């Protein structure tokens, strides 16, 4: 795990990036921007003590959205390797459940990422 500081306007990651880390927001506010969003307003907000960037890590897929700092932010990053170690130490049922929930969430968001309503 590593503590990282970002300035307002910086991206933690962009849509299409590899998903080597997931993040815990310690301080600030993160905006999640879907690829079709050309506005300055995020599709979703991440607040303090919330995790983000988990879907790509859980599913071993590319980032489906970008995470931009709406304010100066401090995050803690957890590498995919560290995440998998923690997950492998837990109940196998939990591992399957997390993966299933992530896939279902991505499917629910898919129309939004393709520009459909």
Predicted segments with their positions:
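Regulatory nucleotide-sensing modules
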Residues: 1-33
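Cyclic nucleotide-binding regulatory module and flanking cytosolic helices
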Residues: 1-8, 57, 88-90, 114
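Short beta-strand segments
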Residues: 2-4, 41-44
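Cyclic-nucleotide recognition modules
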Residues: 11, 43-97
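Solvent-exposed strand-loop boundary residues in beta-sheet-rich modules
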Residues: 36-38
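A small-molecule sensor/coupling module
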Residues: 83-117
């Amino acid at each position: 795990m590593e503590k990282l500081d970002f300035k307002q306007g910086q991206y933690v990651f962009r849509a299409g990036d590899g998903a080597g880390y997931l993040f815990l927001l310690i301080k600030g506010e993160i905006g999640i921007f879907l690829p079709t969003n050309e506005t300055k307003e995020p599709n979703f907000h991440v607040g303090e003590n919330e995790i983000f960037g988990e879907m790509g890590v859980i599913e071993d897929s590319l980032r489906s959205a970008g995470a931009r700092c709406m304010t100066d932010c401090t995050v803690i990053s957890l590498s995919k390797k560290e995440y998998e170690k923690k997950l492998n130490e837990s109940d196998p049922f939990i591992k399957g459940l997390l993966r299933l929930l992530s896939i279902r969430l991505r499917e629910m968001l898919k129309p939004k990422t393709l520009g459909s309503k």
